[in-house]
UniProtKB/Swiss-Prot annotation:
Family listed: Belongs to the AKAP95 family.
Annotated signal peptide: none
Region: Disordered, residue numbers: 154-194, 243-302, 472-582
Keywords from the UniProt entry: Acetylation, Activator, DNA-binding, Isopeptide bond, Metal-binding, Methylation, mRNA processing, mRNA splicing, Nucleus, Phosphoprotein, Repeat, Transcription, Transcription regulation, Ubl conjugation, Zinc, Zinc-finger
Gene: ZNF326
Name the record gives this protein: DBIRD complex subunit ZNF326
Organism lineage string: Eukaryota, Metazoa, Chordata, Craniata, Vertebrata
Chain location of the short sequence motif Bipartite nuclear localization signal per the record: 238-260
One GO term (biological process): regulation of RNA splicing
Residues found modified as Phosphothreonine: T251
Entry's Gene Ontology cellular component terms: DBIRD complex; intracellular membrane-bounded organelle; nuclear matrix; nucleoplasm; nucleus
Modified residues (N6-acetyllysine): K247
Biased composition (Basic and acidic residues): 272-290
Keyword hit for 4Fe-4S: no
Length: 582
């Protein structure tokens, strides 16, 4: 190589660097094809170093070569777009291959291939129909704005600058990508010009042009679709597509599923059918209440035996005992009078009303005592109950029946031992609990009194009481049954014990069931005001009370619920109720 050739070689190399900014070979060959050593690019004659260099570096158009003058300064003729089988974006030689390192190997590797990709995007690579990347895709114009690209950009040589921005390649059935990238088979991409996108949304099929094209995964019901509503195919995953069952815009559910709910809605809205349905519902509610009462009776009978109906109770004070002397003392005690005073203070009832309420409790006590006298087999029943309690218990079970003391304030059973009872009396929990329970009884007493007076049968009794007649006197058998039922209702308010009193009384209670439910509903109101949680807490424990000073409030709650509902149906006509409500 003489001085002139050496000078030409260095000049060509410098010129190449100035034009291209890169000093490495780009591809499988410039003008001559895949191999640069055989001189296919020359037009004849002996190859000189100048021609070799010019051909090798794509500088024929600068050094006077005739073949490459039609190409721009930044690109040589590139036959790669028409070639197939190889990776089209890979050069003919690796960066470390010896053939490439002959000329420019010392300069290679300084620039990344992303520069080449940026040049290739303007070079008409897609004009041959075999491109892997659209020249102007929506991702290049507005990257990250609408990422609805198909698999044409999933290639590792796409325009994504970071691997983290590249969506994961998915199969033909995943995330709605088409089975084959359309741009690979010659179809053109109209993303940049507002045409239908070939990219993937998060739903199935093509994105559509904002409502003009429906996605194949959506089933549109044209028969039931309203005329004034336009169907908009919104982007969303399959979960969202199945979500709107009653939205007006485009039903995404199957036709039979859509038609059935519409019929149901139309039937429910028809005024002619609402009345019978309401009647049926009311009947069901009444039956449910009575069934609930029966279950409560059975539950109480299982827990406490049939004798629990023979207990004497005071509905206002939640007092419960099996001894007549105890109830007599209670009705004459100061605690009972304090409760009545509290009721009068809160409700502002007249003295006549308070006397009537007291007489109601006395009448209940008398009725219970009469029932006990009529029960001849009470002792036998108790023995049978005792046998049932210990049924199935063997010596190996190490169980025995003992007496216990029930504390309604704490809802605790205490062994009937002096030491245990004294220890509980001095415990801080009992000291706090008895104060809270006392306040609770006062609150519930007001609600119980109001619910009793809301009972229409009790109102009739009160009218007779005001006239000076005996309100509890039995005039007719039917009236007597109603009265007994009412009294039982009152007792139910306090405890469902009296609901279960006798089979005859249960029948009477069913006849007067609505009245009983009214009282029960009223007591439920009490529970709601005071907090049903508290009432329930007092509930079962109170009913079980062996020592028998407090009635169970738990059963009262259920009765109160029924009474509340009945009370709503029957407004309070009782003249004394108005001050209560105020």
């Amino acid at each position: 190589m003489d001085f002139e050739d050496d000078y030409t070689h260095s000049a060509c190399r410098n010129t190449y660097q100035g034009f291209n900014g890169m000093d490495r070979d780009y591809g499988p060959g410039s003008y001559g094809g895949m191999d640069r050593d055989y001189g296919h690019g020359s037009y004849g004659g002996q190859r000189s170093m100048d021609s070799y260099l010019n051909q090798s570096y794509g500088m024929d158009n600068h050094s006077g070569g005739g073949g490459g003058s039609r190409f721009g300064p930044y690109e040589s003729y590139d036959s790669r777009s028409s070639l197939g089988g190889r990776d089209l974006y890979r050069s003919g030689y690796g960066f470390n291959e010896p053939e490439q390192s002959r000329f420019g190997g010392s300069y290679g590797g300084r620039f990344e291939s992303s520069y080449r990709n940026s040049l290739d995007s303007f070079g008409g690579r897609n004009q041959g129909g075999s491109s892997w990347e659209a020249p102007y895709s929506r991702s290049k114009l507005r990257p990250g704005f609408m990422e609805d690209r198909g698999r044409e950009n999933y290639s590792s040589y796409s325009s994504f600058s970071s691997p983290h921005m590249k969506p994961a390649p998915v199969g033909s059935r995943g995330r709605g990508t088409p089975a084959y990238p359309e741009s690979t088979f010659g179809s053109r991409n109209y993303d940049a010009f507002g045409g239908p996108s070939t990219g993937r949304g998060r739903g199935r099929g093509h994105m559509g042009d904002f409502g003009s094209i429906h996605r194949p995964g959506i089933v549109v019901d044209y028969q039931n679709k309203s005329t004034n509503v336009t169907v908009a195919a919104a982007r969303g995953i399959k979960r969202k597509m199945m979500q709107p069952f009653n939205k007006p815009s485009g039903t995404f559910i199957k036709k039979p599923k859509l038609a059935k709910p519409m019929e149901k809605i139309s039937l429910s809205k028809s005024p002619t059918k609402t009345d019978p349905k309401n009647e049926e519902e009311e009947k069901r509610r009444i039956e449910a209440r009575r069934e609930k009462q029966r279950r409560r009776r059975e539950k109480n009978s299982e827990k406490y035996g049939d004798g629990y109906r023979m207990a004497f109770t005071c509905s206002f004070c939640k007092f419960r005992t099996f001894e007549e002397k105890d109830i007599e003392l209670h009705l004459e005690s100061s605690s009972h009078q304090e409760t009545l005073d509290h009721i009068q203070k809160q409700t502002k009832f007249d003295k006549v009303v308070m006397e009537f309420l007291h007489e109601c409790m006395v009448n209940k006590f008398k009725k219970t005592s009469i029932r006990k006298q009529q029960t001849n087999n009470q002792t036998e029943v108790v023995k049978i109950i005792e046998k049932d309690v210990m049924e199935g218990v063997t010596v190996d079970d190490h169980m025995m029946k003992v007496e216990t003391v029930h504390c309604s304030a704490c809802s605790v059973y205490i062994p009937a031992l002096h030491s245990s009872v004294q220890q509980h009396l001095k415990s801080p929990d009992h000291i706090k609990g008895k104060q809270a329970y006392k306040e609770q009884i006062k609150r519930e007493s007001v609600l119980t009194a109001t619910s009793i007076l809301n009972n229409p049968i009790v109102k009739a009794r009160y009218e007779r009481f005001v006239k000076g007649e005996n309100p509890f006197e039995i005039q007719d058998h039917s009236q007597d049954q109603q009265i007994e039922g009412d009294e039982e209702d009152e007792e139910k308010i306090d405890e469902p014990i009296e609901e279960e009193e006798d089979e005859d009384e249960e029948e009477e209670a069913e006849e007067v069931g609505e009245v009983e439910e009214v009282e029960e509903v009223e007591e439920v109101r009490e529970g709601g005001i005071e907090g049903e949680g508290n009432i329930q807490g007092v509930g079962e424990g109170g009913e079980v009370g062996v020592v028998g000073e407090v009635e169970g409030v738990g059963e009262v709650e259920e009765v109160e619920e029924l009474e509340e509902e009945t009370a709503k149906e029957e407004p309070a006509d009782f003249p004394v109720e108005q001050p209560e409500e105020n």
